[in-house]
Amino acid sequence: MAVITEENSNNLFCTDSLELTSNKQDDQVISNYLKPVRSYPYIKYSRSSLLLTASTTLPENFVISFTNSIESEESDKSDYLLDHAHSLQELSTTHSSLSSTLTSMSEESSSTESKFATLNDGINGGNPYSRLYRKNPSSDPNDIPPQFHFKKKSKSFYSSMYDKMKIRINILPNGNDNFIKKRNSGFALAPIACYNHTSDLRKLLKHKVTGSNASIFKRINPRSRKRVVNPECSVTDTPYGKLNNVIGEGASSFIRVINDRNKLPIYVAKVFRPPLDTSLLRRYVRYFIAEYTFASTLRHPNIIKVLDIIYKRHTILQIIEYVPYDLFTFITKGHCSALKADQMFFQLLDGVAYMHSLGIAHRDIKLDNIMLDENLNVKIIDFGTAFVFHYPFESTTLMSDGVVGSKPYVAPEVLTQKPYDPSAVDVWSCAIVYCCIALKRFPWKVPHTSDKRFNLYVTQRNDPNTKSQLIESLPMNSRDTIYHMLDIDFNTRCSISGARSTTWMQQVRKTLI
């Protein structure tokens, strides 16, 4: 007789397999005894074997018993079965002790959870994510998870990117780029280009141009030839409204107004011209998405609000708040008083100082990129050439390289083909903007010794016994600030925050409150 009995055990966990074998004459006897339990899923019974598989759970008071005459030659098998039966009994004892241990642990866990819930409800209003129960963050940078490790770009990366920007592309549809080649000496460096703003010079400089330069000014007249807009890339409808008249255009985009139901302008759409070379489309998309990322992140009263970016019919559009005036037209028509000029200059410095506090340099501060709202407040636009020169929690300043910006406004170090501080370039450009507002003209065409006016400024500045004609022509209260902002050496040039904190600017600030 072979008996496998397990009584008074709760859910025995069998970690071994037990096989009961019999000869043919014993099949009927075994079958009769196992009929009641043959339906159990953890018992596998065949013609000549009964198998209790591993990792099965046996019910309480489970008994398997069968009797039959076992031949002497089967005695070894009987001993084998009895050994397994004893093993199962030992496992049952072990399981019982583990079960009691788990039960006690479960009770302790439930009591701990109830205590935590009571404490949490009483102290923090039932918030399990309270700061009271958070662990203090580690101050060791090595404990930061790897997914939050960021590396700043190397200088070689920016150099290679700048070389790639020199690839020649056709900006106008149908390959009609002759007009741009004549107007913009920085053509084919798009989308980042050094813009030769001789059209601005033609408006501001009052003297008559003669000789070979006369034909150049005739060709660069922006009204002399209209741009052709590719109808396949034009978009007439957006979620913000329908696009209407074109109110402005540049080398790589044009501006269309969006009116409300009363036909009053509420937004403008900056529509970018895609390159005809499809291989450059990826760079085109990446460039303008980067511009949108800069603009949409900035939140300041003197910086334009960029609301959305839309990709439709292979054309990228930026939805921007509508501002009715531009600073260039405002000053050329003679509407700018001395006090208003100082106020607008303070607002310009305030907006640029905000950008610099975030480690961002504009790199293309000029009259065309400064708009005015209904109350004549300054709005800085166009962040296509913005550059991150400082990262949080770092003391180093990333240097920029390459000719970026508009020639009358750029600092002299930009033309030296050496790395330079982009924030110092913004300081220089802001000072040039003030000179244009106050004098109604540019101080020079390009900050290079080949330009007579700039060469005169450098000569007079280096001579301690001579006063600069440019500085002396400015209003008295602004001379000292502009003098330090137009320092030839960008290492000793004053910062935007320094210019903003001068006595002159603080007095102007009081008039705006």
Curated annotation (Swiss-Prot):
- Domain Protein kinase, residue spans: 241-505
Chief location of this protein? Answer: cytoplasm
Query: Which Gene3D superfamilies does this entry report, sorted A to Z?
Result: Transferase(Phosphotransferase) domain 1
Ordered alphabetically, the record's keywords are: ATP-binding, Cytoplasm, Kinase, Nucleotide-binding, Nucleus, Serine/threonine-protein kinase, Transferase
Q: Where is this region: Disordered?
A: 98-120
**One protein family per Pfam:** Pkinase
Q: EC no.?
A: 2.7.11.1
* Species this chain originates from: Schizosaccharomyces pombe (strain 972 / ATCC 24843)
* Amino acids binding ATP: I247, G248, E249, G250, A251, S252, S253, F254, I255, K270
- Name listed for the protein in its UniProt record: Serine/threonine-protein kinase ppk8
Active site residues per record: D364
Q: Which SUPFAM superfamilies match?
A: Protein kinase-like (PK-like)
Biased composition regions of type Low complexity, renumbered to the chain: 98-114
Which GO molecular-function terms appear in the entry?
A: ATP binding; protein serine kinase activity; protein serine/threonine kinase activity
Which top-rank group of organisms is this from? Eukaryota
Reaction catalyzed: L-seryl-[protein] + ATP = O-phospho-L-seryl-[protein] + ADP + H(+); L-threonyl-[protein] + ATP = O-phospho-L-threonyl-[protein] + ADP + H(+)
